[in-house]
C-alpha cells in the first residue's frame, strides 16, 4: 500500500511539472485557483485579432467566405516574425444551426489545422487559434449545438467561459449571447443577450484572483459603442453593461476585444472615441475595442506585448479579388433586420432542400 501511494504521488508530481512546462495553458473555472502564470517565457510577443468571419459552405456562396478567411490566415502566418496565437471573437459562420449550419462549420474548420483537439492557423501547428461564439453562431434555432460539436467541445460545462494565460497576459473569453429579442426596437440593431449575472460573477472571481500583470477580455458584442441621435447606444450587450465596465476599470483590464459592428473603433469607459494609433494601453484605463470584420472586407488587428506595455495597433485590410457572387452581394452589409430576414428565408429554404435530399 505504501508503494502504491508513493507511485500515485510521483505520478501527480510528473503531471504538475508537465503542465507548468506548457507555454499556453487553458484554465477551466474549476481549476483556476490552483494554477498560476506559466514561467520562463518572453513577455515580448504579439497576437492577431480576427472577428466576424461569417463562413458559409461552398454550396451557399461559391467558396467566397472560405477564401476570405483563408486569405487572412495565410497572410498573418506568412510574417517573418510569427504571432504567438490568433483569436476570433464570434460570428464564425453565417448561421450555425441545423444541418446547413453544420455544413458551414465544416467549411470553417477546413481553414485550420488540428492537433490534440486544438485548432491552429499554420501547418506546423505552432500558432493556436482561440475562439468565442457570436450571435450568428446561434442562428436560427438559438443554440450552440453545432459550435460545440465542431469548434469547441472543451468549455461546454463552463458555458463557453475560459482563460488562456500566455506569459504575463491573461485572456478571458466570454459568450455575450444570442440576439436579445425582448425589446422589439432593438431588432434593427441587435443587442447581445448577455452578460448574465453568473457571467459577471465568474469574471469578478477570476479577475480578483488573477496573477498576471495584463488582462484582456474577449467577447463578440461590445460594451461601449456610438449613440444615435436620440442618445441610444445599439449593438452592445443588453445585460449588466455598466457592471461589466466597472469591473474592467476596477481590476485594471487593459483591453476588451470585440467585433459584431463590422467597424474599427476604440473607446474609453467614458465613451470617448480614440483615434491616435498605436495606443500604449499603459497610458489609458480600459480600452473597449471593436475590430473590423472579415465579411465586408478582410481585416485583422495586431496586439503587441513589449515588456510591461501592450500596444494596440490599427486594423489592417487585405485586398483580395472579389469573384462575381450574387449571394455574397445580398448578404453583405450591416447587422440590420433586413439582412437578417433575408438570411432567415435563405436558411429555411436551404434546410428544406437538405431535408429532402439527405437521409437522417
Regions found by a protein language model. Give the residues of each.
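N-terminal active-site segment of His-dependent metallophosphoesterases
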Residues: 30-102
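Alpha/beta-hydrolase fold active-site loops
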Residues: 45, 84, 161, 168-169, ...
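N-terminal Sec-pathway targeting helices
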Residues: 2-12
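Active-site neighborhood of phospho(di)ester-bond hydrolases with catalytic His/Asp-centered motifs
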Residues: 49-51, 86-91, 128-135, 216-220, ...
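Extended active-site neighborhood of metal-dependent phosphoesterases/phosphodiesterases
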Residues: 97-210, 243-249, 255, 266-314
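Hydrophobic core
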Residues: 13-20
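A short C-terminal boundary segment appended to hydrolase-like catalytic domains
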Residues: 40-41, 301-360
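Short, flexible/disordered intra-domain loops and linkers
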Residues: 58-65, 97-104, 183-190, 227-238
Amino acid at each position: 500500500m505504501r508503494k502504491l501511494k508513493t507511485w500515485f504521488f510521483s505520478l501527480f508530481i510528473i503531471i504538475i511539472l508537465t503542465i507548468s512546462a506548457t507555454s499556453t495553458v487553458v484554465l477551466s473555472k474549476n481549476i483556476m485557483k490552483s494554477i498560476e502564470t506559466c514561467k520562463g517565457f518572453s513577455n515580448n510577443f504579439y497576437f492577431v485579432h480576427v472577428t466576424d468571419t461569417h463562413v458559409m459552405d461552398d454550396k451557399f456562396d461559391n467558396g467566397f467566405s472560405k477564401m476570405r478567411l483563408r486569405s487572412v490566415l495565410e497572410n498573418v502566418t506568412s510574417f517573418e516574425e510569427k504571432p504567438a496565437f490568433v483569436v476570433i471573437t464570434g460570428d464564425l459562420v453565417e448561421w450555425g444551426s441545423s444541418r446547413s449550419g453544420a455544413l458551414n462549420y465544416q467549411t470553417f474548420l477546413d481553414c485550420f489545422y488540428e492537433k490534440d483537439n486544438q485548432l491552429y492557423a499554420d501547418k506546423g501547428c505552432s500558432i493556436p487559434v482561440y475562439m468565442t461564439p457570436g450571435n450568428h453562431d446561434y442562428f436560427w434555432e438559438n443554440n450552440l449545438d453545432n459550435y460545440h460539436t465542431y469548434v469547441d467541445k472543451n468549455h461546454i460545462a463552463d458555458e463557453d467561459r475560459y482563460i488562456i494565460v500566455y506569459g504575463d497576459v491573461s485572456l478571458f473569453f466570454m459568450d455575450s449571447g444570442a440576439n436579445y429579442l425582448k425589446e422589439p426596437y432593438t431588432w434593427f440593431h441587435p443587442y447581445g443577450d448577455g452578460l448574465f449575472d453568473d457571467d459577471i460573477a465568474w469574471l469578478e472571481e477570476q479577475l480578483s484572483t488573477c496573477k498576471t500583470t495584463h488582462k484582456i477580455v474577449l467577447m463578440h458584442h461590445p460594451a461601449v459603442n456610438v449613440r444615435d441621435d436620440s442618445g441610444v447606444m445599439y449593438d452592445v450587450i443588453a445585460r449588466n453593461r455598466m457592471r461589466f465596465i466597472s469591473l474592467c476599470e476596477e481590476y485594471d483590464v487593459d483591453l476588451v476585444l470585440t467585433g459584431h459592428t463590422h467597424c474599427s473603433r476604440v473607446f474609453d469607459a467614458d465613451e470617448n472615441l480614440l483615434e491616435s494609433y498605436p495606443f500604449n494601453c499603459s497610458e489609458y484605463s480600459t480600452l473597449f475595442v471593436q475590430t473590423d470584420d472579415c465579411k465586408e472586407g478582410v481585416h485583422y488587428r495586431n496586439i503587441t506585448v513589449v515588456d510591461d506595455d501592450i500596444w494596440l495597433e490599427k486594423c489592417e485590410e487585405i485586398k483580395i479579388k472579389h469573384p462575381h457572387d450574387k449571394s455574397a452581394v445580398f448578404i453583405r452589409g450591416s447587422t440590420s433586420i433586413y439582412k437578417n430576414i433575408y438570411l432567415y428565408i435563405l436558411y429555411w429554404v436551404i434546410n428544406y432542400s437538405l431535408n429532402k435530399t439527405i437521409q437522417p
